[in-house]
Each structure stands twice: as C-alpha cells, then as structure tokens.
Amino acid sequence: MLRPWLKPVQVGKYAGKRAAVDAYSWLHKGAYSCALELGTNNRWWIRQRRDAPYVRYCIHRAQMLRHYGITPVIVFDGDRLPAKGGEEKDRRERRAECLRKGHERLAARDRDGATFMFAQGVDITPAMAHELIAALKREGFEFIVAPYEADAQIAALAQLGAKGDPGGVDIVFTEDSDLVAYGCPLVLFKLDKFGEAQELLLEDVMAGPPAEAAAGVNGANGAGVDGDELDDDEDGIAVVGGARGKKKGGAGAARSKPGAKGPLNFVGWKHEQFLELCVLSGCDFLPNIRGIGIKKAHALVAKHRSVAAVLAVLHGDKKIHVPPGYDDDFRHAFWTFRHARVYDPLQRRLRPLNPMPVELEDEATDTAFLGASVAADVAVEVAEGRMDPITRKPFVVPPSPQKQKGWTPRGRSQGGGGGCIKNGGGGFIKNGAGTGPAKPPPKPIAFANLFAGKKAKTVGRGLNFDAG
C-alpha cells in the first residue's frame, strides 16, 4: 500500500537530526544470526562474557547512525496491552510450533531447516532487551522503555520533535508501518548496513499518489512496505498489523480512488479518517471483518466519510457478517492508537498520547484496554531500564563483556580516517584525519534522565493533521 510513496535515501541526509529507533525491530533482525543457538539454548556468549550477537547487531547500527551525524534514541516495548491479548496468543502458538518443527529438523540432521524454523520462532524477551540496554549505557546511547507499545512512545517523541521541545525526534526508523497510523510525519524503513533506507513522508501520502504511480508506472498494485503486493481484489497487506482481507467482490468505487489497480488516494482526508481505515482493514488490536480488506475499507471510508456511517452500512449488508461487539471493539482499537499511554520525559510520568475524549475521562468508563496507569516512580524505573516492564521487578545487571569490534563505514578499515574508530579504552570517536588523541567514551545516560530537574511542560495535542 505504501510503496508508491517510498523513496530511497542515504541517512547522511539527516545529519544533525535526532531519530527514534524501534529497538525490537533491530533485535529481531540481530537474533536471526544466532537463531540456532537461541532455539537450543546454547548461549555461548554468556560463557565467553561477550555481547550477544543480537546486541552487537543493534550497537553496530546505532554506531552507524552516530557516524552519519544522527543521534539515535532507542525505544523499547514495555508491558503487553490487553487489546493485543488475542494477537499475542496467536504469536505464542506460532512460535511454539516453529520451535517444535525446528527441534524435529535438528533431530533429522537438517541443520539449515532447523535454523530457519528457529528463526521464525524467535521471541525477544525483556531480559534480551535489557542486555541491549546495558550495552547502550556502556556506549553512551540514549534509550527509553515505553510503558506499553514502543510505537506509541515513538509517536510521542515525534510530537515533541514537531513542537521543538527538548528530547523530541525528527525521524523514525522502523520496519512496522504502524508508525504511519500513529501519525509520525517522517518514517524510514529498510535501513541497511550501508546507511541506505526507504523514506516515507506522511504529508506526501495525504497529498495523493505520486504522478508516476497514478499513471501506473510505479506501485500500480499498491504494494506494502514489506514487498507483499495487493492483488486485484482484497487480499492485500493493510497499513497496520499485516491483517489480510479475503478475496471478495468490490464494494464500489471510491470517489478519491484513481483506478481499480492504482494506488489509494487520500486527498482531502483527515488523519482521523486515515486511522479509521487502518483499524477497519485490520490491525494488532482488532482483526478485520471477513471480506473487508484494505481496498474495500478505503472505498467505504472515502464514500461515507465517517466510521459510524461505514458501520451502519456493514450492519445493513446481509452478505457481511459483523462479529458481535465489533462496534465497541472498533472504538477501543481506535482509542488505543489515538490515546495510548506513553511516558513523558519532561514531566516524568505517564500521559495519553493525545488528550482523552470526554467519554474516556468519565471515571465510570472502563479504560483497561489502554493498560493500567502506573505510579510515577514505577514509570520512571521502567523508562530508565532498571525495572522489568512486565513483572515490575528490578533487573539483574549483567556482567560487563570484553572489548569488541565496532562498526566501520563501507570500504574503510578501522585504521583509516573518517569512520568510527575504536580507541584503547573501548570507546568510539569521529576521526576525520585518522590522527589525534582518542576521546573517552561518552557518559552513559538514559534518555529519560535527560530532563531531570527541568521545569515540566504540558504537552499539547502535538501534530495537527486536520489543517487544510
């Protein structure tokens, strides 16, 4: 769906900017390199007092961004949301099945097959995340642990950046298109080891299809960011959650749609309508109605302009089965995106991503679907990486690993100039001329500590998608 708006970019373009990074997207990629060891519980790096391969992968990526003049802020997932209970259960079952098949293939001496299945069943735990946090502290990188969804926390940092508040971010690195639904204005996907990525500007999406895409030259099938293509019907990747619709007949042409096979058109849409489309087509918080995929959802929202009208139409269609309680579940999913609980590094407490609507401010309203609101002191301990966000118990600090090799830019050895050069003390320095004394590693600091003692500000609504 988003492919027509993706543009290749070299991250050096954003030198001097601050970037939020979805930590778990990096951890998952890094874990693939040691999937066999994780699947068989052979964690040799602990015995050798070395960083785990998934930690080294993340640190190298962070060092690369630092080399290009970008300040990364690594954002971790926190506790599980009740709204994702069903999705989490399905994922656990899929992982367990993959692990079972991995052990079967290993017993059959199929090492490659076992590695593949173990990679599909990798589960990133809070303990693994804490290993990365320890390494980030050691290398002086900023980080923050979200109370719940990292995506919502990243969106909150993007709000701060848009307002010019300290600690905000200008860009986002992720592999999850949920960040577009959350309203992040600038998202980069597919970051590789050479600093090349795919850039997506939300304002471009809302301004309509690019000229070449509208003409059918690029992205005529509206492929998603993960490369999965939409077919002529509804079996396509939605904006959020990867939910798939079944192949069904069309629901009629949308007024804002350039053609049956062309990219979707959001000209004249408000961000609220865009988010309604994302939820309606299926997301982590709510599966799609059978027969309602991304294209049909777009057609319905474009025609009726509000989800209330869309739901009324669906309830009146005898060919569509709307599950019992779907209307309430839809509102909860929409509110979970819009009003997620996030950590405010300025006020050092939790707040909603956007101010609560009147119906959620009523004390009689059950807001358990947003996750429990925790005390400020607990929120700080979680955000600064000292407390497990799920068990709410202090982490055990892992032993410090031995010195390890760092990232170097393409085509350069660690002895050359212009890169990140490892010094005798284990830190990394910018060395444009290849000479000069090595600087000590930066002082470890948690992102959430940056604003301690500063006057708290009230964070407003942040980004305004309704203008124009």
Predicted feature locations:
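Non-catalytic nucleic-acid-binding/docking modules located in mid-to-C-terminal regions
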Residues: 6-15, 209-219, 224-468
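Amphipathic alpha-helical interface elements that mediate macromolecular binding in regulatory proteins
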Residues: 53-63, 130, 134, 152, ...
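Acidic, metal-binding active-site segment of PIN/NYN-like and related structure-specific nucleases
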Residues: 154, 162-191, 223, 243, ...
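Acidic, PIN/NYN-like endoribonuclease modules and their adjacent C-terminal/linker elements
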Residues: 184-216, 228, 259-261
